[in-house]
């Protein structure tokens, strides 16, 4: 990777974080930014043709969720054997398409959190009876200096809503227990937030390694929390991801 070029595709709040970390890790490397916004930043490009000239080996797609599929198609049609990291969620809906030319990764980085690694190790050979997973936050506090009702999170047609925005919970539940089977779910817009995407989700299902799984998500909790409760035979675990604490009994 020493001489490979990096491209950040899109330049919102998450992309800014990626650039910050990459600059720190690789201070001498050229990091290109693709954005149609008129922003003053080094190595910015605003035409897709320029990407073909740059020939990046590593790409991070940080565009709006609704654009992820067409953005990936662009790289699929024009590049081979490059590494592409797509910010979660991968898509806003299911597409019947198989990508073959490049390696594609999705940014579900919670799997690498030490607490999550601890839980994964502890439940490896256990049958969990019940899993209660909860994540509540307040959308207006998510992005500094940006009006929340102008962000993609507030707009259903741009891939916003708690189901996609907070899909880390569905990802790590699948990672822990296997493919989820839905029994029922309640998804709604219930608060007074100025958005047209859903701000509430209550999912109930099961998986191979857990009989009962509930996942609760919302955009309107003034006091944020991210909690996991797992219960089984001679086993009880509570994890608080925001406070980076876990208790095992």
Outline where the language-model segments fall.
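N-terminal Rossmann-like dinucleotide-binding module
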Residues: 1-41
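Rossmann-like NAD(P)-binding element
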Residues: 51-71
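Beta-strand-loop-alpha-helix segment that lines the small-molecule cofactor/substrate pocket
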Residues: 58, 69-111
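Contiguous beta-strand/loop segments that form the cofactor/metal-binding neighborhood of enzyme cores
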Residues: 164-165, 170-243
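Conserved acidic residues
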Residues: 42, 57, 129
């Amino acid at each position: 990777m020493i001489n490979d070029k990096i491209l950040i595709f899109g330049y919102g709040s998450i992309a800014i974080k990626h650039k910050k970390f990459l600059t720190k890790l690789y201070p001498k490397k050229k990091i290109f930014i693709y954005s149609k916004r008129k922003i003053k930043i080094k190595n910015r490009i605003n035409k897709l043709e320029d990407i073909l000239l740059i020939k990046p080996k590593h790409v991070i797609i940080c565009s709006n969720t609704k654009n992820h599929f067409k953005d990936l198609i662009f790289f699929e049609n024009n590049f081979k054997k490059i590494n592409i990291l797509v910010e979660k969620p991968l898509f806003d809906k299911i597409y019947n398409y198989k990508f073959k030319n490049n390696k594609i990764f999705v940014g579900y980085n919670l799997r690498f959190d030490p607490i999550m690694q601890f839980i994964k190790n502890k439940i490896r050979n256990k049958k969990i009876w019940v899993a209660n997973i909860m994540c509540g936050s307040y959308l207006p506090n998510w992005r500094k200096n940006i009006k929340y009702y102008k962000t993609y999170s507030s707009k259903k047609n741009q891939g916003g809503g708690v189901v996609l925005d907070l899909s880390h919970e569905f990802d790590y539940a699948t990672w822990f227990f296997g493919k989820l089977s839905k029994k029922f779910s309640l998804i709604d817009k219930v608060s007074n937030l100025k958005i047209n995407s859903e701000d509430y989700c209550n999912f109930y299902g099961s998986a191979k390694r857990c009989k009962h799984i509930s996942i609760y998500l919302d955009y309107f909790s003034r006091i944020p929390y991210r909690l996991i409760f797992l219960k089984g035979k001679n086993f009880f675990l509570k994890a608080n991801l925001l406070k980076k604490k876990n208790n095992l009994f």
